[in-house]
């Protein structure tokens, strides 16, 4: 599948759980040093060979209920959807890694005065909650993902080049804009919410059905994030096919879709900036003329189009996940603990090559 379609799609998952449409400048500035693991030396791929994009889908629900009065520095909502794209220009491949929102990992905290309050091992999804602005929420999420994968710099600079975040309350709008997405319902988990969402049935999702299918975890027969992640991948695959058809029919369709969803350009999150928290006002600039802005990115729409062209014929690899164990923590919330070296092994195979002679 060509990539203006697939990345947009991929990035449409981002709108399905996000929405992207390509991206990756001709040059990026991320840098990883060589490293030694288990007596073997690994060399990082040159920065010119890789472009990384984090897709963040977040909402403002807690245990199925919207947070009516979040604290001043806890405004971001939790990131229920996280997908990292690693674009390998040398091998012309796109790696995809989807994270379980309940993955336990260090995240940055913010005190009531807005200052950095250190780190704590919590669910990955909570990283997005801390901060007063959307920019801060996204920067904190980037840092947490980098920390989990072991690719962060000592000075908190970015190894992840770009991000696109979406308030996933916009999923119904996205679904409506594309004319509805057809999926095969995998099981009867959602019957209590909508009797038409019966396992084995193939239907076009309309209205609230898209939200039920992609966002619901509580009040289902299988209330785990793993089950929801599986439904999200089903939705993405169908959305990819639909977008491919629409893009082939109209090359400007992606720009139209992005404009309808509304996007804010984050000018503050660059590869040269520190990721510490500040109390500065947000400096995001709306770059679409819509009333609502469901999307934020630290890359412009014009540059989003550049990569789509550059990677048009790249191979898009299957979505990967990290393995681990779910359990009920002492805080009465689900914890997902990765197996030992699970994240490290993915990082080594994706960002590094083993040095000759080892």
Placement of each model-derived feature along the sequence:
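Gram-positive cell-envelope targeting signals
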Residues: 1-30
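Non-catalytic, solvent-exposed segments at the cell envelope interface
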Residues: 25-358
């Amino acid at each position: 599948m060509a990539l203006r379609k697939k990345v947009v799609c991929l990035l449409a998952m981002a709108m399905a759980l996000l929405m992207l449409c390509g991206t990756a400048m001709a040059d990026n500035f991320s840098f990883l040093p060589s490293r030694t693991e288990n007596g073997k030396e690994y060399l990082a791929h040159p920065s010119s060979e890789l472009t990384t994009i984090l897709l963040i889908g977040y909402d403002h629900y807690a245990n199925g209920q919207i947070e009516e009065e979040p604290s001043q520095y806890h405004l971001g909502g939790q990131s229920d959807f996280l997908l990292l794209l690693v674009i390998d220009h040398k091998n012309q491949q796109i790696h995809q890694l989807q994270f379980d929102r309940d993955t336990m990992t260090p995240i940055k905290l913010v005190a009531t005065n807005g200052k950095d309050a250190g780190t704590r091992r919590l669910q990955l999804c909570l990283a997005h909650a801390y901060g007063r602005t959307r920019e801060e929420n996204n920067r904190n999420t980037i840092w947490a993902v980098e920390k989990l994968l072991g690719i962060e710099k000592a000075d908190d600079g970015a190894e992840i080049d770009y991000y696109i975040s979406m308030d996933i309350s916009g999923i119904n709008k996205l679904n409506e804009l594309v004319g509805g997405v057809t999926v095969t319902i995998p099981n009867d988990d959602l019957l209590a919410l909508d009797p038409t969402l019966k396992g084995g049935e193939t239907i076009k999702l309309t209205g609230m059905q898209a939200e039920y299918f992609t966002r619901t975890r509580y009040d289902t027969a299988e209330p785990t994030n793993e089950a929801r992640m599986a439904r999200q991948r089903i939705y993405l695959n169908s959305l990819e096919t639909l977008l491919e058809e629409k893009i082939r029919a109209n090359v400007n369709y992606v720009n139209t879709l992005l404009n309808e969803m509304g996007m804010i350009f984050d000018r503050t999150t660059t590869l040269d900036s520190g990721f510490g928290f500040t109390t500065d006002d947000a400096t995001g600039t709306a770059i679409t003329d819509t009333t609502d802005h469901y999307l934020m990115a630290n890359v412009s729409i014009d540059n989003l189009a550049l990569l789509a062209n550059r990677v048009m014929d790249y191979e898009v690899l299957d979505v990967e996940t990290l393995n681990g164990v779910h359990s009920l923590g002492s805080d009465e919330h689900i914890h997902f603990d990765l197996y030992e070296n699970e994240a490290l092994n993915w990082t080594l195979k994706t960002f590094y090559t083993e040095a000759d002679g080892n």
